[in-house]
Amino acid sequence: MNRKRTIILDTETTGINQTSLPHINHRIIEIGAVEIIDRCFTGNNFHVYIQPGRSIESGALKVHGITNKFLLDKPIFKDIADSFLNYIKNSILVIHNASFDVGFINQELEILNKKIKINTFCSIIDTLKIARELFPGKKNTLDALCTRYKINKSHRNLHSAIVDSYLLGKLYLLMTGGQDSLFSDNTINYKENFKKLKKNIQLKNNTLRILHPTLKENDLHEKYLQYMKDKSTCLWN
């Protein structure tokens, strides 16, 4: 049986270009990715720090805490490019605010004169787009969504590509619980998918309606949250 790999991915960078595309004149310094198959974390992860060949901006340092000194002995992107590409090849990539990370990764590939873009050999799902459909008008950062879904993020003092990938993986499973078939292996048709998804979660008038649980349902929900806190690696509805 050919089981499709889902890779949850995040990056940290030297900073963000405020006047052009975010990746212009900046580089990736960390890649974190976790593998999910059959809605289970497999433990087959990819994590690397990268020497960017330029200094880290102070604003970015405050976000992720990764220093120039720490990166001095780390590999450059060229040294890890092939292993990274082999890891994500033909997978479904799940990324929060995908255009940001994809822009940085494609720039790194362009610097190496590789005539490829990751969206040509991976399907890409943007969880920010999913969140905006589910919660229009709400704050939909990773931090805000973890709070909304009661995902424990007490260990997330600073941004970390590998930690954030794991949190995003748990979040993605919860947001799409029981809805794997909504997403095509080759292309993501958000318009049609979210027509189905909105119907399934009873969205009306483009706003999220709160359906109050019965006492029994609430008790089951509390037991389910406790189950999650016990660090189960698989999530089902």
Swiss-Prot record:
CDD domains: DNA_pol_III_epsilon_Ecoli_like
GO BP terms, alphabetized: DNA replication proofreading
Binding site for a divalent metal cation 2: D10
One Pfam family cited in the UniProt record for this chain: RNase_T
EC number: 2.7.7.7
Keywords from the named record: DNA replication, DNA-directed DNA polymerase, Exonuclease, Hydrolase, Magnesium, Manganese, Metal-binding, Nuclease, Nucleotidyltransferase, Transferase
Cofactor binding note of this UniProt entry: Binds 2 divalent metal cations. Magnesium or manganese.
GO molecular-function terms, A-Z: 3'-5' exonuclease activity; DNA binding; DNA-directed DNA polymerase activity; metal ion binding
Annotated catalysed reactions: DNA(n) + a 2'-deoxyribonucleoside 5'-triphosphate = DNA(n+1) + diphosphate
GO cellular component, one term: cytosol
Self-association state and partner proteins as the record states: The DNA polymerase holoenzyme is a complex that contains 10 different types of subunits. These subunits are organized into 3 functionally essential subassemblies: the pol III core, the beta sliding clamp processivity factor and the clamp-loading complex. The pol III core (subunits alpha,epsilon and theta) contains the polymerase and the 3'-5' exonuclease proofreading activities. The polymerase is tethered to the template via the sliding clamp processivity factor.
Function according to Swiss-Prot or TrEMBL: DNA polymerase III is a complex, multichain enzyme responsible for most of the replicative synthesis in bacteria. The epsilon subunit contain the editing function and is a proofreading 3'-5' exonuclease.
Protein name: DNA polymerase III subunit epsilon
Source organism of the structure: Buchnera aphidicola subsp. Acyrthosiphon pisum (strain APS)
Taxonomic placement: Bacteria, Pseudomonadati, Pseudomonadota, Gammaproteobacteria, Enterobacterales
